[in-house]
Amino acid sequence: MNVCVVSTFKCTFDVLEAKIKEDLASGAGAFVADYELVKVNDHKSIFMAHVTDFEAMGAMMNSPEMKKWDEDNGCVDSVYMLEKMG
């Protein structure tokens, strides 16, 4: 895993999870090789992923559709790059 996204949101975790699954099925699956989604609580999650194309990920996250979804659902993402030690 090389990316960690910590998200807070006003919608429920189930709504966020459905959105992530929809995104993976409709295009993001082309650049996400593997992932884990963890529910911290009803309004916070941690998404760990192995991303193979950071440019494509950035384009998706900054698309008008994604920005609208984030705004409508009060979603704020903090994205971290990870590097395996040892």
Segments predicted by a language model, with ranges:
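Short S/T/G/P-rich N-terminal loop/turn motif that feeds into the first structured element of a domain
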Residues: 1-69, 75-86
